[in-house]
Design a protein with these regions (language model features):
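Short catalytic micro-motifs in class I SAM-dependent methyltransferases
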Residues: 90-94
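A conserved beta-strand element that flanks and buttresses the S-adenosyl-L-methionine
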Residues: 87
Length: 175
């Protein structure tokens, strides 16, 4: 799961974003190399939430200038706030599939008007008893379409080698 750096699809997406003041959330982020990359690119409003405290401590060690107030040790489903972009990078697949509708609802609640869920989801069966749980593109469409305009849900052309052909890049805008 932890590849040790920001994944290419996420990096290439954020490199196209000019507004450094956007409020960005990375849920279930683990060591969040995405947050480190965004911070180093000048994004000022990046928030990381994780149910495990150690990865948040690791982020602060790696990036001493990262605002401590934006490293939230709590359950994603209890989070309050409003964000312009929520980054999906191996959080959805870590959740028990019975929580997927709750995830969609919570993402929708946390996004601002015109807010976006952007990131990667596995388009492969993977595991059924433990994370990472896989999924199918068609199921994601069914799950997200009631609350989101599905701008992009395509096989990621720039996945890392070990995930090539197994993940879709998504860009869903809040309805």
């Amino acid at each position: 799961w932890d590849i040790g750096y920001v994944s290419t699809p996420i990096k290439e997406y954020i490199d196209q974003v000019d507004n450094k003041e956007l409020r960005i959330l990375i849920p279930g982020a683990g060591n969040s190399y995405e947050a480190e990359y965004f911070h180093n690119q000048g994004f000022n409003n990046v928030t990381v939430v994780d149910i495990s405290e150690q990865p948040l401590k690791n982020i602060k060690i790696r990036i001493p200038s990262f605002p401590s107030l934006n490293l939230l040790y709590q359950d994603f489903f209890d989070l309050k706030g409003e964000f312009d972009i929520i980054i999906e990078q191996t959080f959805f697949c870590a959740l028990d599939p019975t929580l997927r509708q709750d995830y969609v609802n919570k993402i929708h609640d946390l996004l601002s008007e015109q807010g976006k869920l952007v990131g990667l989801m596995f388009d492969a069966p993977l595991n059924t008893e433990h994370p990472p749980f896989g999924g199918k593109k068609k199921d994601y469409k069914t799950l997200f379409e009631p609350k989101f305009n599905l701008k992009t849900i395509e096989l990621a052309y720039n996945s890392i080698k070990s995930r090539a052909g197994k993940e879709v890049f998504v860009n869903f805008m809040k309805k």
